[in-house]
């Protein structure tokens, strides 16, 4: 697939977990961007499940609900209106509510919480993570000399501790990596 696109089965539900990594050291993410809007549109058209997680020092669930596809007996225009309204509502919800409550960022715990929302779901499973990649708490705390650590050694250590998040069969979209404020 080309950059920014995913190949999702059109006849399968979409299960989307969004990790919002709003933090003091990163610019605010635009939840109306093309990739997330496309994923939300596909979810709202095909039905599935939406999970929203805030990645702060104690990651928490913002939202987790099933999303029904529009009634097929409606006109295509009406279905499009319903889908667009749902996409706009989801983006607005994230923009307004993705606010850290706890200092720091525990990326591993946030990804694990998001992965729980995808476990056991049949169909397309997608994790969309909007964060700068700097975890400052939990098992992958970059303030503890991890910036220069060998990535394979970090992954091995996370696995040995039982902290390697299982994303088998999940499409992963990362946005905002390396974006830091100031």
What are these model-predicted stretches?
Residues 1-9:
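C-terminal region of N-terminal signal peptides and the immediate post-cleavage residues
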Residues 8-123, 125-128:
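Von Willebrand factor
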Residues 19-28, 93-104, 179-182:
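Second-shell loop/turn segments in exported
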Residues 22-27, 58-60, 119, 134-141, ...:
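Short acidic, S/G/P-rich loop/turn micro-motifs used as interaction or catalytic elements
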Residues 29-39, 107-112, 145-159, 182:
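Well-ordered, non-membrane alpha-helical segments in soluble/globular domains
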Residues 40-45, 112-123, 135, 139:
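Sec-exported extracytoplasmic/periplasmic mature domains
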Residues 134-182:
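VWA/integrin I-like adhesion module and closely mimicked acidic/polar interface patches used
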């Amino acid at each position: 697939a080309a950059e920014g696109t995913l190949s999702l089965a059109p006849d399968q539900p979409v299960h989307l977990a969004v990790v919002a990594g709003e933090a003091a050291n990163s610019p605010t993410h635009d939840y109306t961007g093309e990739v997330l809007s496309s994923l939300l549109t596909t979810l709202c058209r095909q039905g599935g499940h939406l999970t929203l997680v805030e990645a702060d020092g104690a990651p928490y669930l913002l939202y987790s609900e099933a999303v029904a596809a529009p009634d097929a007996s409606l006109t295509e225009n009406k279905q499009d209106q319903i889908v667009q309204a749902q996409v706009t509502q989801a983006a607005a919800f994230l923009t307004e509510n993705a606010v850290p409550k706890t200092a720091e960022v525990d990326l591993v715990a946030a990804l694990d919480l998001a992965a729980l929302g995808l476990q056991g779901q049949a169909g397309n499973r997608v994790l969309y993570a909007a964060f700068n990649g700097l975890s400052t708490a939990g098992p992958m705390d970059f303030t503890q000399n991890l910036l220069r650590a060998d990535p394979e050694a970090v992954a091995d250590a996370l696995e040995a501790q039982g902290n390697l998040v299982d994303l088998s069969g999940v499409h992963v979209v990362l946005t905002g990596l390396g974006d830091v404020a100031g």
